[in-house]
């Protein structure tokens, strides 16, 4: 299975730099079996069935972009930092500019309330240990940090305060992600309430999306690719709700690839179980899904692991047809773009 099998031409004009307003006005490509329909997210109330269960990732994006200063004697230098993920040895793994000029033991000052020491430095990133922890760290980061937009948006415009709202889901609870579970950005409170009134169930899980989600695949034989690891949790309650839905004949529908990867990790034995830890599950064609019946997700980058995931769910030829339709009909792509609802079979 070659990387080139997952390539397609995407006009740059289809890369969304702002979301639809309101959130539910985003377009929705409904693909069920061989059928494709052009709908809108607000139409989900009539598409989902009573007894369906949506699995939502309740991670909260932290303001992971920081600008600080490093001082040597009388000289000060500006340093830009993007937090990537908590480090096993303590502190945070981070990218920094200029990385090559930083030295272990140096302190970067981000504000009067937040500083960090360079504990380790590698070829591509470093480990920072902050002078605050817990709630004090969260508060200082909220003051000093900015929302970490995906690179394909940040390359086209500067982040602003509107992104603080746009790049956060309405059910975000547990801080720790440095990228949003973007399919969930399409939901607002009225839509959630309307779906609940229809008899659709909701289960929340937590997967802290890391910066590794944007890393390119660098091998031609995709089966040899190694995924980045991300921390997640499926609680006892969540596992029981999903199991009950399956037993009752309902559909389990993750909202976003992060929720899908997490519940499939928790069902590695064949049945969904409570689960907590790091997952590096890599889903590509040939994978046998254990609990997922359908998926709501945005449109993904060419040659990405997420395109491989949806190809595993729907089949490679079917995904090619779906993406060809999306491009021809001017669907908006990536994090702030439109959505698809992928239902195999039908």
Curated annotation (Swiss-Prot):
Gene Ontology MF terms in the entry: S-adenosylmethionine:tRNA ribosyltransferase-isomerase activity
GO biological process: queuosine biosynthetic process; tRNA wobble guanine modification
Keyword S-adenosyl-L-methionine in record: yes
GO cellular component, as recorded: cytoplasm
Reactions it catalyzes: 7-aminomethyl-7-carbaguanosine(34) in tRNA + S-adenosyl-L-methionine = epoxyqueuosine(34) in tRNA + adenine + L-methionine + 2 H(+)
Entry keyword Cytoplasm: yes
Enzyme Commission number(s): 2.4.99.17
Listed InterPro entries: QueA, QueA_dom1, QueA_dom2, QueA_sf
Similarity section: Belongs to the QueA family.
Described purpose of this protein according to its UniProt entry: Transfers and isomerizes the ribose moiety from AdoMet to the 7-aminomethyl group of 7-deazaguanine (preQ1-tRNA) to give epoxyqueuosine (oQ-tRNA).
Subunit structure: Monomer.
Identification of the protein by name: S-adenosylmethionine:tRNA ribosyltransferase-isomerase
The organism of origin for this protein: Cereibacter sphaeroides (strain ATCC 17023 / DSM 158 / JCM 6121 / CCUG 31486 / LMG 2827 / NBRC 12203 / NCIMB 8253 / ATH 2.4.1.)
Lineage start: Bacteria, Pseudomonadati, Pseudomonadota, Alphaproteobacteria, Rhodobacterales
Gene that encodes the chain: queA
């Amino acid at each position: 299975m070659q990387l080139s099998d997952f390539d397609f031409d995407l006009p740059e004009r289809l890369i969304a730099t702002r979301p639809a307003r309101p959130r539910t006005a985003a377009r929705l490509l409904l693909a069920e079996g061989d059928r494709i329909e052009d709908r809108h997210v607000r139409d989900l109330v009539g598409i989902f069935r009573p007894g369906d269960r949506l699995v939502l990732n309740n991670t909260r994006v932290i303001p992971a972009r920081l600008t600080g200063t490093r001082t040597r004697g009388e000289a000060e230098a500006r340093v830009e930092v993007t937090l990537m993920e908590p480090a096993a040895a303590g502190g945070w793994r981070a990218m920094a500019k200029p990385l090559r000029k930083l030295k272990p033991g140096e302190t970067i000052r981000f504000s009067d309330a937040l500083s960090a020491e360079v504990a380790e430095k590698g070829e591509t990133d470093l480990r920072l240990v902050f002078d605050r922890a817990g709630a004090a760290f969260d508060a200082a980061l909220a003051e000093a940090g900015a929302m970490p937009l995906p690179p394909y948006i940040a390359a086209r415009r500067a982040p602003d305060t509107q992104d603080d709202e746009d790049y956060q889901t309405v059910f975000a609870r547990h801080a720790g992600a440095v990228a949003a579970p973007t399919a969930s950005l399409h939901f607002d409170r009225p839509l959630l309430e309307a779906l609940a009134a229809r008899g659709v169930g909701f289960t929340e899980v937590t997967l802290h999306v890391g910066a590794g989600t944007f890393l390119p695949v660098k091998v031609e034989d995709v089966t040899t690719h190694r995924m980045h690891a991300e921390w997640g949790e499926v609680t006892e309650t969540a596992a029981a709700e999903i199991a009950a839905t399956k037993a009752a004949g309902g559909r389990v529908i993750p909202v976003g690839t992060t929720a899908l990867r997490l519940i499939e990790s928790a069902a590695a034995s064949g049945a969904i179980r409570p689960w907590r830890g790091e997952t590096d599950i890599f889903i590509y064609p040939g994978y046998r899904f254990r609990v997922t019946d359908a998926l709501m997700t945005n449109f993904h980058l060419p040659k990405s692991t997420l395109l491989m995931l949806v190809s595993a769910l729907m089949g490679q030829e079917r995904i090619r047809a779906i993406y060809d339709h999306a491009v021809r009909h001017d669907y908006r792509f990536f994090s702030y773009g439109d959505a698809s609802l992928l239902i195999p079979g039908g």
